[in-house]
Swiss-Prot record:
Summary of subunit composition and partner proteins: Core subunit of respiratory chain NADH dehydrogenase (Complex I) which is composed of 45 different subunits.
Membrane topology: Multi-pass membrane protein
Source species taxonomy: Eukaryota, Metazoa, Chordata, Craniata, Vertebrata
GO biological process terms, semicolon-separated: electron transport coupled proton transport; mitochondrial electron transport, NADH to ubiquinone; mitochondrial respiratory chain complex I assembly
Keywords: Electron transport, Extinct organism protein, Membrane, Mitochondrion, Mitochondrion inner membrane, NAD, Respiratory chain, Translocase, Transmembrane, Transmembrane helix, Transport, Ubiquinone
Transmembrane segments: 4-24, 35-55, 84-104, 121-141, 177-197, 213-233, 241-261, 273-293, 301-320, 325-347, 366-386, 413-433, 457-477, 480-500, 583-603
Enzyme class: translocase
Domain of life assignment: Eukaryota
Organism, scientific name: Mammuthus primigenius (Siberian woolly mammoth)
Catalysed reactions, semicolon-separated: a ubiquinone + NADH + 5 H(+)(in) = a ubiquinol + NAD(+) + 4 H(+)(out)
GO molecular function, one term: NADH dehydrogenase (ubiquinone) activity
Major subcellular site: mitochondrion
Name of the protein in its database record: NADH-ubiquinone oxidoreductase chain 5
Cellular component annotations (GO), alphabetically ordered: mitochondrial inner membrane
InterPro entries membership: NADH_DH_su5_C, NADHpl_OxRdtase_5_subgr, ND/Mrp_TM, NU5C-like, Proton_antipo_N
Gene: MT-ND5
Length: 603
């Protein structure tokens, strides 16, 4: 085994050690928390070495020493694929999880089950690393389902709250819809290629792969909360803030986009799937950006921004730039985790207040958190020379020079401008102006478990974009010349969004409207989608089921089939065996005539 595979396995083994210690002894002390955090830290440091070796040598590695089973001609083995994608993403996921775990020591310190919470976070990370490094579809599916079940357990962490249980159930059900597409893809490959190994699938490169790739797109739509299967993502904010930070930055929602990137050798020549991915991503990034403009919950605004950025990654995959989408996925992880941790700092200090209208003036009382939110918001909008700029600006430039689907380009540009608008809105309402929270609120930003993770992520949000983009190899011929108006398009729409949002916030800060407009209601209710899918459609289906049950069971079976049918049968049988016809009037008339004739004869 070469150093890359050896050190990668060492980092994975280190992560499993805290899990095995819980099987040997009952960890009810806080030592387990620090053991887990230290294990993630050591795994991060060790994982940097294989990444640096890969950057130097540019040689992939495969580990396939563990044979599992053989079913007829199908050989199943446990194998790891250590290429550019996995070796780049693993240190990022470990670094962010390390920061989130340290933040959780402060945020969740009063939780009586904090040891189990750390165990769940660690399992969440391990399942994502299994997905990233998988070399076959079976192992990928194990990681895929692993992040799904861990997200369910973590979103419903505060299971005493009905909203948390409902949100976890939503996440599970929407992902079950996507999993049908994943299983369909696995079935297609096992029927037509008799293999789940990535090397054999990519080398064979079958021609008609539209059906399995559409199944993969459906799976990614559910996992990455694209339009149609997106309502679970804002609802998932019912979980603790560290869960939201890990779920949105480097685990659950990134799994769908990463799987599409992994299958780019099959997608790059399939125009049907590429166009579907492009249009789906464009609709998602615009729709969620519109919904984020009018939300007042700070966590939901950041959650909808995640969905919008995932749509932007899908657009990038749709224009056949998977490496650029992966770069944006890596850079996005830093500032998105920082935004969630900063919002968690504000929420915790303001006694669980999440409404940005009840904040204000926090730049004076929480300077480090305010700095992190400003830097994270600027990086999210693609401000030059921050982390987001090195991935978002090339995406817009590539889309401008692409020859496919101008409609999707225009929609994406509008969404990029709206990103600047809702980022400005967070800064304006939460950080600036006069304080709007209770005067006796106790705010403390001096805990090192709070400050140190945010500081590390601030550095990552400033510098890591440069290093990641420098080591991303372009796989298409770059444009040597570009018109200036296209070159500065991304910066122009971002500045437009900043300007419009600032002016509107200043103009309407003290205004009150009596009746919301239809567009405002459309945005605040997330396009009526949750109302339609979670209320109207279930009500209609239940009503129809009740009517059918009433008609079939009560009217047909219980009323007509048994009582009325028995009555009809008995009446028919009685009329057949009896000579009485039941004509009472005729009987009385004949009786009357007989009496009358008898009397006349007697007289």
């Amino acid at each position: 085994m070469n150093p890359i595979s050896t050190l990668t396995l060492a980092s994975l083994i280190i992560l499993t050690l805290p899990i095995t210690t819980t099987l040997l002894q009952n960890n009810k002390t806080n030592c387990f928390l620090y053991i887990t955090k230290t294990a993630v830290t050591y795994a991060f440091v060790i994982s940097l070495i294989p990444t640096l070796l890969f950057v130097q040598s540019n040689q992939e590695a495969y580990i396939s020493n563990w044979h599992w089973m053989t079913i007829h001609t199908l050989k199943l083995s446990l194998s790891f694929k250590l290429d550019f994608f996995s070796l780049t993403f693993m240190p990022i996921a470990l670094f962010i999880t390390w920061s989130i775990m340290e933040f959780s020591l402060w945020y969740m310190h009063s939780d009586p089950h904090i040891n189990r919470f750390f165990k769940y976070l660690l399992l969440f990370l391990i399942t994502m690393l299994i997905l990233v490094s998988a070399n076959n579809l079976l192992q990928l599916f194990m990681g895929w389902e692993g992040v799904g079940i861990m997200s369910f357990l973590l979103i419903s962490w505060w299971h005493g709250r009905t909203d948390a249980n409902t949100a976890a159930l939503q996440a599970m059900l929407y992902n079950r819809i996507g999993d049908m597409g994943f299983i369909m893809m696995m079935a297609w490959f096992i029927i037509h290629l008799n293999s789940w190994e990535f090397q054999q699938i990519f080398l064979t490169n079958p021609k008609n792969t539209t059906l399995p790739l559409l199944g993969l797109l459906l799976a990614s739509t559910g996992k990455s909360a694209q339009f149609g299967l997106h309502p679970w993502l804002p609802s998932a904010m019912e979980g603790p803030t560290p869960v939201s930070a890990l779920l949105h930055s480097s685990t659950m929602v990134m799994a769908g986009v990463f799987t599409l990137i992994r299958f780019y050798p099959l997608m790059e020549n399939n125009l049907t799937v590429q166009t579907s991915t492009l249009c789906l991503g464009a609709i998602t990034t615009l729709f969620t950006a519109i919904c984020a403009l009018t939300q007042n919950d700070i966590k939901k605004i950041i959650a909808l921004s995640t969905s919008s950025q995932l749509g932007l990654m899908m657009v990038t995959i749709g224009i056949n730039q998977p490496h650029l989408a992966f770069t944006h996925m890596c850079t996005h992880a830093f500032f998105k985790a920082m935004l969630f941790l900063s919002s968690g700092s504000i929420i915790h200090n303001l006694d669980n207040e999440q409404d940005i209208r009840k904040m204000g003036g926090l730049y004076k009382t929480m300077p480090i958190t305010s700095t992190a939110i400003i830097i994270g918001s600027l990086a999210l909008t693609g401000m030059p020379f921050l982390t987001g700029f090195y991935s978002k600006d090339p995406i817009i430039e590539t889309a401008n020079m692409s020859y496919i689907n101008t409609w999707a380009l225009l929609v994406t540009l509008i969404a990029v401008s709206m990103t600047a608008s809702y980022s400005t809105r967070i800064i304006f309402f939460a950080l600036l102006g006069q304080p709007r929270y209770p005067t006796l609120t106790r705010i403390n930003e001096n805990n090192p478990h709070l400050v140190n993770p945010i500081k590390r992520l601030i550095l990552g949000s400033i510098f890591m974009g440069f290093f990641i983009s420098m080591n991303t190899i372009p796989h298409t011929t770059p444009q040597m010349t570009m018109p200036p108006h296209l070159k500065f398009m991304a910066l122009a729409v971002t500045l437009l969004g900043f300007t419009v949002a600032t002016e509107l916030n200043n103009m309407t800060h003290n205004l009150m409207f009596k009746q919301p407009s239809r567009m405002y209601t459309f945005s605040t209710t997330l396009g009526y989608y949750p109302t339609t899918t979670h209320r109207i459609l279930p009500y209609l289906s239940l009503t129809m089921s009740q009517n059918l049950a009433t008609t079939i069971m009560d009217s047909i079976w219980l009323e007509k089939m048994i009582p009325k049918n028995l009555t009809t049968m008995q009446k028919t049988a009685a009329s057949l065996v009896s000579n009485q016809k039941g004509l009472m009037k005729l009987y009385f008339l004949s009786f009357l005539l007989s009496i009358t004739l008898g009397l006349l004869i007697a007289l």
